[in-house]
């Protein structure tokens, strides 16, 4: 299958949103402040459209086939920017719902961080996830980072195995919204 990896564009947002939800699961409800799936997806799509939060399309790269179908996504950014991106979201939730939430830090300042990666169900097993990870590594190296990191749910054994094959090391346990994750880091040359 032919595809290209490129910076997400505004017209990709409607295809990006369900893949982010598939990857982050229940975290999406916390990020949006919603309890209903339909409303949560609408709010999550608004976050993807917004330029000032971690899940913005500006932090997202897509694997596109020849007909502009999104086959996979990777959301990534400078670890130092994570807190800044989250403050904007926390402020938005406070203004909209009168609700204060605190979003957990997910990366160290010296890391280029993969926040979310997901390949659509019909494109799995074609190596797209591996290529998205290689792309992230190239981006991080180009930007001068010596570390590429991600967090993976403890129970996602296949994903952990893939990341290990790609050179990531499990460095420490991590908690995100009271759920157990493993922080994994790949040192770049």
Task: Describe the function of each predicted region.
Residues 1-11, 31, 189:
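Conserved N-terminal entry element of GNAT/NAT acetyltransferase domains
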Residues 25-48, 93-94:
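Conserved GNAT-fold acetyl-CoA-binding loop/helix
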Residues 49-62, 80-84, 113:
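A short helix-loop-beta-strand connector motif used in the catalytic cores of GNAT acetyltransferases and
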Residues 62, 69-78, 113, 118:
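Conserved beta-strand in the GNAT
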Residues 78-112, 116:
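Conserved acyl-donor/pantetheine-binding loop and adjacent beta-alpha core of acyl/acetyltransferases
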Residues 80, 149-151, 164-183:
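Conserved catalytic-core motifs of GNAT/GCN5-like acyltransferases
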Residues 112, 124, 140-151:
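Conserved GNAT acetyl-CoA-binding A-motif
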Residues 125-138, 161-165:
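Conserved acetyl-CoA-binding loop-helix of GNAT-fold acetyltransferases
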């Amino acid at each position: 299958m032919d595809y290209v990896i490129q910076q997400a564009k505004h017209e990709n947002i409607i295809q990006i949103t369900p893949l982010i939800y598939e990857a982050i699961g229940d975290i999406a409800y916390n990020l949006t402040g919603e309890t209903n799936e339909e409303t949560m997806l609408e709010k999550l799509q608004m976050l993807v459209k917004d330029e000032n939060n971690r899940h913005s399309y500006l932090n997202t790269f897509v694997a596109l086939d020849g007909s502009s179908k999104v086959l996979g996504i990777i959301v990534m950014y400078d670890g130092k920017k994570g807190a800044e991106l989250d403050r904007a979201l926390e402020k938005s939730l406070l203004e909209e719902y009168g609700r204060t939430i605190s979003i957990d830090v997910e990366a160290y300042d010296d890391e280029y961080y993969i926040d979310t990666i997901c390949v659509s169900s019909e494109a799995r097993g074609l190596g797209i996830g591996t290529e998205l990870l290689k792309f992230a590594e190239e981006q991080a190296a180009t930007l001068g980072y010596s570390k590429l990191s991600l967090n993976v749910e403890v129970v996602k054994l296949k994903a952990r195995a893939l990341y290990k094959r790609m050179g990531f090391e499990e460095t420490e346990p991590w908690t995100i919204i009271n759920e157990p994750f493993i922080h994994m880091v790949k040192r770049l040359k």
